[in-house]
A protein has these predicted regions:
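Functionally critical loop-and-helix segments that line ligand-binding/catalytic clefts
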Residues: 175
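Cell-wall glycan-active module
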Residues: 1-3, 7-143, 148-164, 169, ...
């Protein structure tokens, strides 16, 4: 009997949604989506237990010394240099257009999907349905993205059930959520489509556009290594990525930088756990901007350090003329 009950439960968890999820009418009103479209989407969606299992084990729960080696690897650096070389013209144009460094764009695509090779195998509709209506911790966010997916699929003329992405519903080379896809994806090669799945030119332009819209500051380092001395570190640390302190506050507490900042500079003290104890950094505006892509400070630091490693390795390579397919008439 127990086995039969278990089998029935598993079938229920993977079965197509038969009951309209609660709050659908309110969601339709909030997101300005016809209720009938949300109902049709929900009727095609399936509840996926593997999505709930995966989101309960985020990589960002690891300490820094275990998280960093997942992303800062010789292979990812080498392939980042190769990606940069193959798309040098597009990356140069993105830099000029959006004032966002090529190294950052490459690092984002490298961490998110290993330069487009690992874009996710989960049906996006199912993932967002599962998390939007069966994951109370962040149901509001994912329900909104479920509605945004319906709008996006209609606008781009995509079949809802064929879209694949991450367990959290992120899509394409840059892993954009549906709302980000709608607002920040760009047609960077001028072919009339915003294709972040198979078109690296659009993916590069879209990542750059995202950071420009979130106020990336050209030439400003995201973080600075800090010396803490006798500073009361425990009273200065906090979990949120927002820049809730000023450099004057940290300096008064005893924090030191190689080059002090202006006293009113917004900052945040970070502690990253190494195997032999914490290392300390002072985060600045651009670090916060990276956390708009992913709120985890570990993610933001991995992006920054990978971008620096790729940039250093790229500078050592013989420079050749950019590949012709990346050139778009009238864009350079």
């Amino acid at each position: 009997m127990r086995l039969a009950g278990l089998l029935l439960s598993l079938v229920a968890l993977t079965a197509t949604a038969a009951v309209e999820p609660p709050g659908l009418a309110r969601l339709a009103e909030q997101q300005q989506v016809p209720l009938a479209e949300l109902q049709a989407a929900a009727a095609q969606a399936s509840l996926r237990q593997e999505v709930l299992d995966t989101i309960s084990r985020p990589w960002e729960a690891k300490p820094w010394h275990r998280y960093r080696p997942l992303f800062i690897t010789p292979e990812r650096i080498r392939d980042g240099v190769d990606f940069w070389q193959r798309h040098a013209a597009t990356l140069a144009r993105a830099e000029q257009t959006y004032q966002v460094p090529a190294s950052l764009i490459v690092a984002i695509i490298g961490i998110e999907t290993f330069y487009g090779r690992q874009m996710g195998r989960h049906p996006v509709l199912d993932s967002l349905y599962t998390l939007g209506f069966h994951y109370p911790e962040r149901a509001d966010f994912f329900a909104k993205e479920f509605a945004q997916l319906v709008l996006l699929a209609r606008e781009e003329k995509w079949p809802l059930t064929r879209l694949k992405g991450s367990y959290a519903g992120a899509m394409g080379m840059g892993q954009f959520m549906p709302s980000s896809y709608r607002h920040y994806a760009v047609d960077f090669d001028g072919d009339g489509k915003r294709d972040l799945f198979a078109n690296p030119v659009d993916a590069i332009g879209s990542v750059a556009h995202y950071f420009a819209e979130h106020q990336w500051r050209w030439g400003e380092s995201p973080v600075e290594p800090a010396l803490i001395g006798l500073a009361p570190v425990s009273t200065l640390l906090g979990p949120a990525p927002e820049l809730t302190q000023t450099w004057a506050e940290l300096a008064t507490a005893g924090i030191e930088l190689a080059t002090p900042l202006a006293p009113d500079t917004p900052v945040k003290l970070l502690a990253l756990e190494q195997a032999d104890g914490p290392e300390y950094w002072v985060a600045r505006h651009n670090f916060y901007v990276i956390t708009r892509y992913n709120r985890s400070p570990l993610y933001a630091m991995a992006v920054y350090q990978l971008s620096q490693a790729i940039q250093d390795a790229y500078a050592l390579q013989p420079q050749t003329s950019p590949a012709q397919p990346d050139l778009v008439a009238g864009r350079l």
